[in-house]
């Protein structure tokens, strides 16, 4: 066993909440803009952030990768989609859904909501809903923006406009509070999006990360790389006693022993903390908590 990697894995899992808070702050560094009703439009907005974070948030540091991809996926004038595609591949191959578990502001928002005391419901019997996010990715993020473009050749961001609750939470609400013109322009679409946001909030209190599991197209993209990403979860078969504590602790409904690199795994580290034998740890670029890793 590599003791250093094992200790690092447990420490990383233990401080995940602090890392999520720091990532959210760095992703939304322009805090004063929240009170001005203005969107930051500096050079950093040409760079995408790793998690789901609305471009229209007054505090946003960079661009949302899903929003940016929709804008140019069907464009005949811009080649920015090659950058976005490369961005997805680079982060996916490097970290996989670790981004969902540690670096996504909306993922952290759902985690905080789920900590609210009350009855919690399992999503174990709702696994077929996992595939909905792939349908949303294909239809609302790729196909519709490719087919419907505006006069300057930019794709219409269907997911951002009609589905994404993050846009209301981070964009429309703070902008309307600080900007009377925007407030007066709000209409039925805003009301519809508010209903989606409220539904996600209620579901997040009852279920663990429903948006991540069933709706998020960014999570769908990163999930495609989970099996090949440099950062993985590894199980030491020589230490594992098959007690199943890791799978019981996994709120993403993953059988950790059988499929530690399952597409739904967000690398949150709950299984690492739950294992009574210290048989589970992170693996990066082949370095793990066991010398001969067969999983």
Label each residue range with its predicted role.
Residues 1-257, 263-295:
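Non-ligating segments of multi-cofactor redox enzymes
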């Amino acid at each position: 066993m590599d003791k250093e990697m094992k200790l690092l894995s447990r420490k990383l899992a233990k401080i995940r909440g602090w890392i999520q808070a720091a990532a959210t702050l760095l992703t939304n560094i322009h805090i004063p803009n929240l009170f001005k009703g203005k969107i930051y439009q500096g050079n950093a907005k040409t760079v995408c952030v790793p998690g789901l974070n609305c471009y229209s948030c007054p505090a946003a540091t960079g661009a949302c990768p899903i929003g940016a991809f929709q804008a140019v996926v069907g464009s005949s004038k811009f080649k920015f989609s090659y950058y976005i595609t490369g961005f997805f591949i680079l982060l996916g191959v490097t970290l996989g859904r670790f981004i969902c578990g540690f670096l996504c502001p909306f993922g952290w928002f759902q985690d905080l909501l789920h900590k609210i005391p009350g009855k919690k419901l399992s999503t174990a019997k709702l696994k077929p809903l996992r595939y909905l996010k792939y349908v949303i990715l294909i239809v609302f993020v790729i196909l519709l923006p490719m087919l419907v473009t505006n006069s300057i050749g930019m794709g219409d961001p269907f997911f951002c406009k009609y589905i994404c609750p993050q846009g209301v939470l981070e964009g429309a609400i703070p902008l309307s509070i600080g900007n009377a013109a925007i407030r007066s322009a709000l209409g039925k679409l805003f009301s519809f999006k508010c209903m989606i946001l409220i539904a996600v909030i209620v579901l997040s209190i009852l279920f663990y990360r429903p948006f991540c599991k069933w709706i998020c197209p960014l999570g769908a993209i990163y999930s495609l790389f989970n099996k090949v990403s440099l950062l993985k979860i590894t199980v030491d078969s020589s230490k594992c006693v098959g007690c199943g504590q890791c799978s019981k602790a996994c709120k993403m409904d993953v059988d950790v022993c059988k499929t530690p690199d399952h597409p739904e795994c967000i690398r949150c580290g709950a299984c690492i903390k739950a294992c009574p034998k210290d048989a589970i740890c992170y693996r990066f670029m082949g370095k793990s908590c066991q010398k001969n890793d067969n999983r």
